């Protein structure tokens, strides 16, 4: 495989789809919660396809912007020093171009939804950009990741109902605690490097 193509795949984490699945699950929770029957799910199958595509595209965009912000830190961490931006197999300008391309595709997908979903989706994009920066100002970046990764619950629910009742925020909260759990475990593997970097 061409080395550059392999670097693009690694940058977008296409070799590791589990992150996309973790982003997709909350979207599916929202879509299913908003559906009153299997028949309604079948009728809205196009929305499910849209959310599957959106989850994979925006997870990749999130990984790219994360690596852009963390490129100088990733060099110092054993687990991340071989990432394409850290080892300079991809330039910063290439990475920015990939991020803009992925974000543009994500926006096109988002614009196929209703107005409320678009508004929440734009909020999620802001969170996606803010998350990497929170690692510099708080000991709880997992909370911001959880807010970002689970907002699909709200987008999915709104995509079908065009409303966001108070009750759906309980499901959002469940997702937040779920992500806090698994991401804290994931982050723990870097604890020695985090301490040495400060």
Predicted feature locations:
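Short, Lys/Arg-rich, polar N-terminal cytosolic tail immediately upstream
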Residues: 1-11
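Intramembrane alpha-helical segments
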Residues: 9-10, 83-170
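Functional transmembrane core segments of multi-pass inner-membrane proteins
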Residues: 32-50, 118-124, 128, 143-195
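The first (N-terminal) embedded transmembrane alpha-helix
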Residues: 14-33, 146-150
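Solvent-exposed interhelical
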Residues: 54-107, 176-198
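Hydrophobic membrane-targeting signal helices
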Residues: 24, 28, 64, 109, ...
């Amino acid at each position: 495989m061409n080395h550059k193509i392999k670097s693009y795949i690694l940058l977008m984490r296409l070799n590791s789809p589990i992150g996309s699945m973790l982003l997709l699950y909350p979207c599916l929770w929202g879509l299913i919660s908003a559906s009153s029957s299997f028949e309604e799910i079948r009728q809205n199958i196009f929305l499910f396809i849209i959310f599957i595509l959106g989850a994979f595209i925006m997870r990749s965009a999130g990984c790219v912007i994360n690596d852009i912000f963390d490129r100088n830190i990733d060099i110092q961490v054993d687990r991340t020093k071989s990432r394409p931006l850290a080892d300079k197999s991809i330039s910063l300008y290439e990475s920015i171009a990939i991020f803009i391309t992925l974000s543009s595709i994500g926006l096109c997908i988002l614009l196929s939804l209703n107005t409320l979903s678009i508004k929440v989706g734009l909020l999620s994009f802001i969170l996606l950009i803010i998350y990497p920066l929170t690692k510099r100002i708080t000991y709880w970046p997992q909370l911001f990741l959880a807010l970002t990764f689970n907002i699909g619950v709200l987008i999915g629910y709104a995509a079908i109902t065009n409303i966001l009742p108070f009750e759906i925020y309980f499901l959002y909260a469940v997702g937040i605690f779920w992500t806090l759990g698994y991401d804290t475990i994931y982050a723990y593997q870097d604890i020695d490097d985090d301490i040495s970097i400060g």
